[in-house]
Amino acid sequence: MRIAVDAMGGDYAPLEIVAGAVKWVAEEEERQIFLVGQEELLKQELKSYSYDPSRLIVVNASEVITMEESPATAIRRKKDASIVVASRMVKEKKADAIISCGSTGAQMAAAIFILGRMEGIERPPIVASIPNMTGAYTLLIDVGANVDCKPRQLLQFALLGKTYASIIYGVEQPRVALLNNGEEESKGNTVTMETYALLRQQSGINFTGNVEGRDIFTGKSDVIVCDGFTGNVLLKTMEGMALFIAQGILGAGGPMPAFFQRLDYTQTGGAPLLGINGLSIVCHGSSKREAVYNGLRIAEDCYNKNIIEMQQLELSKISG
């Protein structure tokens, strides 16, 4: 598998990005990494490692898109930015996937303008796997790509989420729920109430109704749909709470419970953007080498399970 890595994105780029990439590519001979970024800087970092230059290749990209820039404007203006060059490699079939720890907005803009959206998808969402009490995972979608959503877009998220649950986790007839401030159909704002009606009418979705925030860890739902603003705040709150509890346990001299280890974003690695014509994995901005390695692992799993083709097939059934 060939992965284009945005080596300039993230709080610890390029040092930790390079370290994670070197570890991943060394494990299997069929793996290949393209480190996309400022060539001289990346070659300097690579001097610390022994690697096969035919499988770990530096691709020069002279520009970087910062967190402060307008994503859509920067994507158009900075044609040689690392995220743009890496995305073009996927578009041109020179790489099978891209991962980035940089600006999520820039990565989404590159996905839309370079890779393109699947037919019937207006906004690509990010899906996150949340461990639940049953030992399985509950998917939360969207967790940050779209802060404002219309009901029909949330319906599209539900379709993509249930497809992902089936393909990646082998769930038959995934139970899809809508995140709300109460379980009753009448709860919520105009958007959630209209979304509820759309989900209930969609025969291709096993819609089980509204769920509250406390239900996320119970395992009563396989997919939980929400807008990206709510999902991102919720995800970051879970990360912070897990860290708070873990530090308390470790401070008291106790062992770290396995459940809290599963909440650690470094173990999850990354989350895919769904609904685009190419595999794009969004990684945490604070990712270090272990998280980068696991992000590459997620990309490989999605690629091996043909996640792009399976999404397109499922969407064609719905539209048909």
From Swiss-Prot:
It is an enzyme of class 2 (transferase). Its EC number is 2.3.1.274. Gene3D superfamilies: Isopropylmalate Dehydrogenase (3.40.718.10). Its main location: cytoplasm. Keywords: Cytoplasm, Lipid biosynthesis, Lipid metabolism, Phospholipid biosynthesis, Phospholipid metabolism, Transferase. It is found in: Cytoplasm. GO terms for cellular component: cytoplasm. This is Phosphate acyltransferase. It comes from Syntrophomonas wolfei subsp. wolfei (strain DSM 2245B / Goettingen).
